[in-house]
């Protein structure tokens, strides 16, 4: 069974943030400039939280009480097929970073929940979950596959 994560879009910096459900800091905005590491604080979850879970592609900061660093992620399979062709996620996110009109925050959150969490939690395809770190996260990935370029998904 996969861990439950809270998925929130930070429109100010146009990044998707993950937080373990139940962490005291859930929903709190990430501090500092993009790429800054969260400040050290007493853990709201045990230090070994997640050690028993099958979480491939999530950086270790995903279990921090301060929440993970800014992340963008998607399902590799969805990127490789025409299922999301009408959304064309990389171009949508790139347009948002340029300040151009694109998918609404609500639509983007729904896309991630539908394409990622349904497959991950219900179908057990967590090995296909990819994490794309575009904002300077300095943490190592847990059981990470080979690095994958966001705009040319492998």
Curated annotation (Swiss-Prot):
Record key words, sorted: Activation of host NF-kappa-B by virus, Activator, Apoptosis, Host cytoplasm, Host G2/M cell cycle arrest by virus, Host mitochondrion, Host nucleus, Host-virus interaction, Modulation of host cell cycle by virus, Transcription, Transcription regulation
InterPro entries for the chain: Transactivation_prot_X (IPR000236)
Pfam families cross-referenced by the UniProt entry: X (PF00739)
Subcellular location: Host cytoplasm; Host nucleus; Host mitochondrion
Any one of the GO CC terms: host cell nucleus
Region of interest: Mitochondrial targeting sequence: 68-117
GO biological process: DNA-templated transcription; symbiont-mediated activation of host NF-kappaB cascade; symbiont-mediated arrest of host cell cycle during G2/M transition; viral genome replication
Record PTM: A fraction may be phosphorylated in insect cells and HepG2 cells, a human hepatoblastoma cell line. Phosphorylated in vitro by host protein kinase C or mitogen-activated protein kinase. N-acetylated in insect cells.
Subunit structure: May form homodimer. May interact with host CEBPA, CFLAR, CREB1, DDB1, E4F1, HBXIP, HSPD1/HSP60, NFKBIA, POLR2E and SMAD4. Interacts with host SMC5-SMC6 complex and induces its degradation. Interacts with host TRPC4AP; leading to prevent ubiquitination of TRPC4AP. Interacts with host PLSCR1; this interaction promotes ubiquitination and degradation of HBx and impairs HBx-mediated cell proliferation.
Family: Belongs to the orthohepadnavirus protein X family.
Role: Multifunctional protein that plays a role in silencing host antiviral defenses and promoting viral transcription. Does not seem to be essential for HBV infection. May be directly involved in development of cirrhosis and liver cancer (hepatocellular carcinoma). Most of cytosolic activities involve modulation of cytosolic calcium. The effect on apoptosis is controversial depending on the cell types in which the studies have been conducted. May induce apoptosis by localizing in mitochondria and causing loss of mitochondrial membrane potential.
Full protein name: Protein X
Originating species: Hepatitis B virus genotype B2 (isolate Indonesia/pIDW420/1988)
Gene behind this protein: X
């Amino acid at each position: 069974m996969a861990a439950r994560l809270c998925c929130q879009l930070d429109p100010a910096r146009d990044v998707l943030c993950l937080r373990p459900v139940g962490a005291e800091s859930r929903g709190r905005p990430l501090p500092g400039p993009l790429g800054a590491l969260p400040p050290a604080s007493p853990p709201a979850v045990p230090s070994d939280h997640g050690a028993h879970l099958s979480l491939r592609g999530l950086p270790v900061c995903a279990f921090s009480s301060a929440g993970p660093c800014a992340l963008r992620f998607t399902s590799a399979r969805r990127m490789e097929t025409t299922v999301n062709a009408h959304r064309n996620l990389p171009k949508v996110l790139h347009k948002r970073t340029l300040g151009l009109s694109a998918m609404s925050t609500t639509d983007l959150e729904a896309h991630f929940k539908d394409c990622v969490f349904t497959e991950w939690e219900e179908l057990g395809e967590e090995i296909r979950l990819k994490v794309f770190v575009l904002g300077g996260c300095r943490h190592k990935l847990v059981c990470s596959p080979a690095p994958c370029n966001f705009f040319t998904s492998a």
